[in-house]
Each structure stands twice: as structure tokens, then as C-alpha cells.
Amino acid sequence: VAEKDLYKVFREAFKGTDFILSEHPKQLKHLYESFTLSDETLSQIYCPDAKAMESAQKRGWGVSPDFSITNTRTGKILFGEIKRQDGWVEGKKPNDGRGNAHERMCKLFAPGLINAYRKIGGITSEDILPFWVVLEGDITRDPKRNREIAFWFDKFDKNYFMWRPNMTSQDLLKHFYMYLRPYLE
């Protein structure tokens, strides 16, 4: 499983430091529940009774990132996603990269989520996004999907990492320490 490799890498690297890696952090699990809809919207949608709403919300109406990295000294948190997807590489067809794992990460760019990530995580600098995406699998070498992802992230190219097959855990750690750790200080 892809996620387990990343988790293992950071757990080892963070031993004896101020940093902690958490799997599926819960800070955003109930993010949407208390969001107030307008009276106009409420008049046009299904509104179950309080008991039904409470039951439905127990599982959480929010976001569950794959991981977070917390600096226990500063309290700042970087939320993260891991995306594994097939792709167009040698011996395959262009449509072999048609999965949508990379497209699903576009929700991270929603203004409301960015604001929540900044508020909860304490990363307020506009020089960086408050999340990090690590991509794995053939997508990391796919000429079409690499262009899409680079275009989407634009000047925030440090907020994603293509963990390609020829790379090691040291490459992943180097990227984190060089480009993202400073924002957790």
C-alpha cells in the first residue's frame, strides 16, 4: 500500500524530533456540519429532523486528509494527500491514465477548504498552500497528467511531489525539509 511507505518514511525520520506524522487526522472531520446555509437554500432542500441529522453527522461531514505533519513546538500543521494512479508510460496507451485520483485533489483548491486548512493548521503565508500532495505510480511519469498537475499548482510547485519509481525516501524527505518544513516553524 502506497500510504504505508510514506508513513513509515516520515515516522522514522521524525523520531526524536518535534514533528509527528498522523494518519487520517481528525481536525477536519466535522468541518461542514456547523456551516450555516442561507434561509433561501434551506427552503429549497431536504431538511431532516434533528434526530436524523445527528445520526447522519456522527460519521462526520468534513474532510479526511490522508496524513498531517505537525510541529509539536509551534502547533502548525501541514495536511497531506497521497494520490496513486496509473498513467500513460512506455508500452501503454494515452487513456491508461484516465483515472481521476489526480482530479479529485482539485477540491483542495476550493477557497473554503484553503481557509479552513490555514486556520486549523496555522500556515498563513501566502507563499505556500496549506497542504501537500504526494503522487505515486505511473502518473508520475505520464506526460499529459504531469502537465495538468503543474498547470493546476502554477507557482505553488512545492506543494506537490512526484515520487517517481527511481526515487528514494531520501528524495521525499529532502523535498519536505527544503520546501515545506520552514512553514511549520
Question: Where in this protein do the model-derived segments appear?
Answer:
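Short acidic alpha-helical/loop segments enriched in Asp/Glu that coordinate divalent cations
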Residues: 21-23, 92-93
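Nuclease catalytic cores
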Residues: 1-14
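Ordered hydrophobic segments in well-structured contexts
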Residues: 62, 66-70, 77-80, 130-133, ...
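Short secondary-structure junctions
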Residues: 14-20
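Extended interaction regions within the primary functional domain
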Residues: 14, 28-38, 144-155
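Non-catalytic C-terminal interaction segments of nucleic acid-processing enzymes
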Residues: 125, 134-185
